[in-house]
């Protein structure tokens, strides 16, 4: 167990080697910090102080309440490794970004408020399949993040308009226009 103990009693290593019993007896809390080369080397404790600290550690290790929580809520399933091609590769039809893509995009400075939609991913894959360029998996993800960011910003954050919808005429006449 590595820890730091607060004490107001300290000694140099040489002094401690010569009179360790007297220094420990003189300390009020049973603890002496021993320094070597102006840095704490170790702590010397009386048996009573050691027993106090061990009892305190045991008390802190016990649960504070008798409520037992179901461990299934704290066990995260191990992520199954996705087969990502090693090195550079050309874009292929079944390519998927990593499961934590949004977090990675945020690390790259691209904040995506929503996950990539299947339509956005399909458009990206189709474009880069036709290009035939090769990049590493991380580079493809960075390109996807930038592509999604740019396409979402071009619409002002609005979803793309359905080109197949039939528009209805507006019968409202704005103020200042004759009707």
Swiss-Prot record:
Q: Where is this region: Required for trimerization and to bind PriB?
A: 1-83
Q: Which GO terms describe its cellular component?
A: primosome complex
Question: Region Binds ssDNA: start and end of each range?
Answer: 84-179
Documented effect of changing residue 140 to A:
Decreased ssDNA-binding (in a residue 42-179 fragment)
Enumerate the Pfam families for this protein. Answer: DnaT (PF17948)
In this UniProt entry, which cysteines form S-S bonds? none
Function, please? Involved in the restart of stalled replication forks, which reloads the replicative helicase on sites other than the origin of replication. Can function in multiple replication restart pathways. Displaces ssDNA from a PriB-ssDNA complex. Probably forms a spiral filament on ssDNA.
Domain text from the record? The N-terminus (residues 1-41) is not required to bind ssDNA or for homotrimer formation. A slightly longer N-terminus (residues 1-83) is required for trimerization and to interact with DnaT. The C-terminus (residues 84-179) binds ssDNA.
This one is known as Replication restart protein DnaT
Supply the source organism for this entry. Klebsiella pneumoniae subsp. pneumoniae (strain ATCC 700721 / MGH 78578)
- What's the encoding gene here? dnaT
């Amino acid at each position: 167990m590595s820890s730091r103990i607060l004490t107001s009693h300290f000694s140099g290593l040489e002094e401690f080697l010569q009179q360790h019993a007297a220094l420990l007896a003189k300390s009020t809390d049973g603890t002496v910090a021993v320094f070597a080369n102006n840095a704490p080397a170790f702590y010397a404790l009386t048996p009573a102080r050691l027993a106090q600290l061990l009892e305190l550690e045991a008390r802190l290790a016990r649960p504070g309440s008798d409520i037992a929580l179901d461990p299934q809520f704290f066990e995260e399933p191990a992520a199954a490794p996705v087969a990502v091609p090693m090195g550079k590769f050309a874009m292929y039809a079944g390519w998927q970004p990593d499961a934590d893509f949004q977090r990675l995009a945020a690390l790259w400075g691209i904040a995506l408020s929503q996950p990539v939609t299947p339509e956005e991913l399909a458009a990206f894959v189709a474009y880069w399949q036709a290009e035939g360029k090769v990049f590493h998996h991380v580079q493809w993800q960075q390109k996807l993040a930038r592509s999604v960011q740019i396409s979402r910003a071009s619409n002002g954050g609005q979803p793309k308009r359905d080109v197949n919808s039939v528009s209805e005429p507006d019968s409202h006449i704005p103020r200042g226009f004759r009707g």
